[in-house]
Amino acid sequence: MTRKNNALPKARTLIEALPWLTRHHGKTIVVKFGGNAMVNEELKGAFARPSFLVHHAGLRPVVVHGGGPQISAELDRYGLVSEFKAGLRVTTDEAMDVVRMVLAGQVQRDVWGCSIVHGPLAVGITGEDAHPISATRHRPLIDGEPVDIGRVGEVTRIDTGAVLALLEDGRIPVVSSIARAEDDGHVYNVNADTAAAALAAALGAETLMVLTDVEGLYEDWPNSDEVISRLTASELETLLPDLSSGMVPKMEGCLHAVRNGVRTARVIDGRVPHSILLEIFTDDGVGTMVVPDEPSVSEGTS
């Protein structure tokens, strides 16, 4: 193949990306980066490079991270038992000290560390810094009864001031999913999927992207590995009761986002090279995309 022909695929890629670059320029995207990906060095690098590329392409990325595996490992090291109820970690006062230490002192530093090689743009904050995330104690229902799971928070308010200030300064905010209560001052462990969705809605983000270690939302798991490529908010709401516990907070987050002003929410496989770029800048994309319901005829003509 000649040098000219070698360059043609690159030109086609740029042509395909151009309308998406134009559409997304100046828009905010919120990317939830899971703790599972942080234990894989290759995935960390694959996440950092595209994040900086979309920044330099004119988008405004905000990263929200979890740290489940790292928290579990540290709890084990301290001899504290990891217990889960309703898919959420039971967080005692002692466990909360570990959660704060791991999310703000270890995982966030890791995200920042793999990002800094691409430029001094990432700035780490938690839900305690200038209170971007406020929460109250969350009591999930199990068999119809509320259950106390300790210092686990339900988001009550998002203050976008600190995040917007960083974005206006050309930075990439990296947010740990810890929140402080407005009433009693307690600090809570907030599910990172939930925090990312609430932040995306408050920022009026163009899209919420949830990076995970599966291909997307499966149509009939475990009977089929067929991935649903696109569904509406109402279609997703119908599926929620039958989803696996691990997918529920991710898909609930997507549902909350698109019903509160976010144009699209996507669950994508972080193991796929350049998955963020493929989802944003190509016609096909990867993973599962959730979109708002189409307005009814009466809504459209009123």
Swiss-Prot record:
It is an enzyme of class 2 (transferase). Substrate binds at G67, G68, R89, N189. InterPro entries: AceGlu_kinase-like_sf, AcgluKinase_fam, ArgB, Asp/Glu/Uridylate_kinase, Glu/AcGlu_kinase, NAGK-C. The record marks K32, K250 as: Transition state stabilizer. It catalyses: N-acetyl-L-glutamate + ATP = N-acetyl-L-glutamyl 5-phosphate + ADP. One of its GO terms (cellular component) is cytoplasm. Keywords: Amino-acid biosynthesis, Arginine biosynthesis, ATP-binding, Cytoplasm, Kinase, Nucleotide-binding, Transferase. GO terms for molecular function: acetylglutamate kinase activity; ATP binding. It is found in: Cytoplasm. It comes from the Bacteria. Its EC number is 2.7.2.8. Pfam families: AA_kinase. GO terms for biological process: arginine biosynthetic process via ornithine; L-arginine biosynthetic process. The keyword Magnesium does not apply. Pathway: Amino-acid biosynthesis; L-arginine biosynthesis; N(2)-acetyl-L-ornithine from L-glutamate: step 2/4. HAMAP family: ArgB (MF_00082). NCBIfam families: argB. Belongs to the acetylglutamate kinase family. ArgB subfamily. Catalyzes the ATP-dependent phosphorylation of N-acetyl-L-glutamate. This is Acetylglutamate kinase. It comes from Streptomyces clavuligerus. The gene is argB.
